[in-house]
């Protein structure tokens, strides 16, 4: 039946809504009405609306960088556990990376993936295919065929296209069929064997470093190619102040988009402390100046998107020495709460944060998600933005517990999450 919510703080950047109001969801799970005009005075008298007491309603989050273990690594995460973890964090749409076993690089594996997603997932899954066969960085995959099968974008995920000739061929193909390509911007030669950001901490811990120039040089290269070959190009994750400077300069010349991981927005290399493998990330955490520059980059609209970079790893692969430990952190459940920290400490406006988590990613992907437009699926979350809680890995829903923020106090928690008008998560 119909559902009525009133007295909510609604933030929907796509429709420029930022007001106290209500939401009406039809029997079909679509949005019928929204905003300040929805209140007790104009509801049918027999209806009992749910009073949200000024809690927030946000569009369901769109997370552009998520690793799921299917196929091949189901012991780390599968579609069912990913869905439940995502829903608890207000995420209703995810873009999945092709770094699976086998790699998502051909039509038959896409069919399998879509079947699994349809059967097991409660959220919207938008799969990526790899740019190159088996993510080896040599032969291109068949963009045209894969796009027809419903692939949303192409990326080698954790790997970079190192060869500039191959990259220009990729860009030409992308331009021809209008598909989106996403680059993990890190020159693999300059970053070779690196574990954490180059600098004082790396030296102190005796770990080989990943210099900031590895990122910058690759961005410079790709944006130079992009001037010649205009295609839909997205830099997956920025991590340094210098990269922001490059982007600021290039934005005036050429059209592209970029993202940042919540890890790089919230943490810096000092958090690694005494070899904490849970903070071995890619791109690495850098200096506090870099973190501040990334926050400023969002403020200045140089960076478009915040991602969780959710990469579940089992205990075994993190309990190794730093150099042997797997890279990545589980983050989809804490993405929104950790992002809200930037609102609570006055770094960013609430609207800027929500835009980077909802309408901006949807716009880049060209999907009609991340908004609360009338007639659209009612994918949204109800959030108490002031509710304090502490991250405890045993409480996490994801199959893998490799959070980068164990024991951190956060402010702001998702209370309910709805997909197509159905409540699929309740705190």
Placement of each model-derived feature along the sequence:
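C-terminal cap of metal-dependent C-N hydrolases
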Residues: 321-324, 377-427
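His/Asp/Glu-enriched, well-ordered alpha-helical/loop segment
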Residues: 204-230, 299-300, 305, 311-386
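Alpha-helix-loop-beta-strand connector modules within alpha/beta enzyme cores
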Residues: 107-124, 172-183, 334, 338
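N-terminal metal-binding scaffold of metallo-dependent hydrolase/deaminase domains
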Residues: 1-43
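Metal-associated gating/positioning segment near the N- to mid-region
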Residues: 53-117
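Active-site metal-binding motif and surrounding structural segment of the metallo-beta-lactamase
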Residues: 39-57
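Histidine/acidic residue-rich metal-binding segments in metalloenzymes
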Residues: 140-306
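Divalent metal-coordination and catalytic microenvironments
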Residues: 8, 23, 29, 54, ...
């Amino acid at each position: 039946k119909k559902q009525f919510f009133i007295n909510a703080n609604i933030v929907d950047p796509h429709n420029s809504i930022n007001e106290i109001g209500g939401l009406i969801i039809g029997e079909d799970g679509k949005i019928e009405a929204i905003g300040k005009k929805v209140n007790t005075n104009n509801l049918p008298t027999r209806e009992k609306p749910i009073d949200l007491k000024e809690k927030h309603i946000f569009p369901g989050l769109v997370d552009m960088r998520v690793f799921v273990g299917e196929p091949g690594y189901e012991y780390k995460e599968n579609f069912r556990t990913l869905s439940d973890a995502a829903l608890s964090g207000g995420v209703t749409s995810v873009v999945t990376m092709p770094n699976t076993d086998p790699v998502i690089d051909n039509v038959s594996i896409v069919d399998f993936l879509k079947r699994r997603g349809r059967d097991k997932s409660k959220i919207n899954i938008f799969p990526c295919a790899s740019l190159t066969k088996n993510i080896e960085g040599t032969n291109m995959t068949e963009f045209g065929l894969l796009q027809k099968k419903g692939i949303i974008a192409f990326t080698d995920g954790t790997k970079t296209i190192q060869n500039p000739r191959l990259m220009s061929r990729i860009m030409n193909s992308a331009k021809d069929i209008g598909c989106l390509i996403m680059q993990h911007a890190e020159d693999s030669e300059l970053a070779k064997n690196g574990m954490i950001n180059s600098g004082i901490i790396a030296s102190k811990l005796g770990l080989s470093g990943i210099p900031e120039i590895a990122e910058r040089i690759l961005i410079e290269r790709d944006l130079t190619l992009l001037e010649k070959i205009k295609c839909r190009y997205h830099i997956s994750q920025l991590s340094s102040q210098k990269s922001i400077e490059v982007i600021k300069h290039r934005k005036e010349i050429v059209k592209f988009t970029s993202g940042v991981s919540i890890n790089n927005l919230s943490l810096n290399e000092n958090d690694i402390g005494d070899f904490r493998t849970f903070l071995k990330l890619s791109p690495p955490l850098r200096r506090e100046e870099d973190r501040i520059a990334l926050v400023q980059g969002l403020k200045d609209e140089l960076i478009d998107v915040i991602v969780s970079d959710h990469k579940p790893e089992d205990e075994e692969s993190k309990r190794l020495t730093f150099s042997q430990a797997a890279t990545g952190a589980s983050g989809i459940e804490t993405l929104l709460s950790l992002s809200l920290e930037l609102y609570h400490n006055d770094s960013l406006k609430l609207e800027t944060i929500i835009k980077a988590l909802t309408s901006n990613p949807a716009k880049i992907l060209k999907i009609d998600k991340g908004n609360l437009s009338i007639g659209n699926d009612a994918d949204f979350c109800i959030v108490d933005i002031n509710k304090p809680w502490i991250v405890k890995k045993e409480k996490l829903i994801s199959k893998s517990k490799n959070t980068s923020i164990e024991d951190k106090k956060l402010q702001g928690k998702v209370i309910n999450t709805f997909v197509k008008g159905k409540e699929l998560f309740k705190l």
